[in-house]
Design a protein with these regions (language model features):
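Positively charged n-region of N-terminal signal peptides that target proteins for export
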Residues: 1-4
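Hydrophobic h-region of N-terminal signal peptides that target proteins for export
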Residues: 6-17
Length: 212
């Protein structure tokens, strides 16, 4: 029987395949280990309808890279506005009350509507700068288009330095989203798996590489 690997080094934290449930502090989410599309994965489902965080216990992150394979799709019975919201929260503080987040809207990636396609990626900073405030005050600055397929495994990477973050998807050489003014400033906090409302989410092969 294949085991779930857990590796923790001084400079790199990495989980091959599923992330052990013992390493997650799931909040408002149900967590299980499953096989999804041939890959051993951590499945997070939205228990209360509002999404939630699953911080990695003991993680501390300021600058560096976070890489993961993820797949998100609307859960069965989700409201029409569900998009399969899925991503990573970082510099999580206050037990999850404050954090930076970059996430995907997988169903937007191939929508027959350019406005939706251009909202395929999203930066938000809770609680002061949710996505809707950023869209209203700075339309187009904190979201972008990238090709996505709901429910399909997607390679996701964010690189963070100071108040700047870049999102890379599908191992692309260039970022599909650049944020130059992270709202929490040059902060330090935990890393968390992030799941939005009405989402069935899968995560595997998480790697956190701090930057000196």
């Amino acid at each position: 029987m294949r085991s779930i690997l857990y590796i923790l080094l001084p400079s790199i934290a990495a989980w091959a395949q599923a992330i052990p449930l013992a390493n997650l502090d799931a909040r408002k989410l149900d967590a299980t280990v499953v096989t999804y599309q041939g890959k051993e994965a951590t499945r997070l489902t939205d228990r209360e309808g509002g999404g939630g965080l699953a911080p990695i216990k003991g993680s501390s992150f300021k600058d560096g890279a976070i890489e993961v394979q993820l797949a998100g799709k609307p859960s069965e019975g989700a409201l029409a506005g569900a998009r399969g919201f899925i991503g990573i929260a970082f510099r999580v503080q206050g037990g999850g009350s404050k954090y930076e987040c970059i996430y995907l809207r997988p169903t937007n990636g191939r929508a027959d509507d350019m406005a939706r396609r251009n909202h395929s990626t999203q930066y938000a900073s809770e609680p002061e700068w949710p996505w809707d405030r950023l869209r209203k005050e700075s339309p187009g600055d904190y979201e972008s288009y990238v090709d996505l397929e709901a429910g399909a495994w997607t390679r996701y990477k964010i690189v963070v330095k100071g108040t700047r973050a870049e999102l890379y998807v599908h191992e692309a050489a260039q970022p599909c989203l650049i944020v130059k003014d992270l709202k929490l400033g040059d902060a330090t906090g935990a890393v968390a798996l992030w799941v939005g409302p009405g989402t069935d989410a899968y995560f595997a092969n998480l790697k956190i590489t701090p930057m000196p």
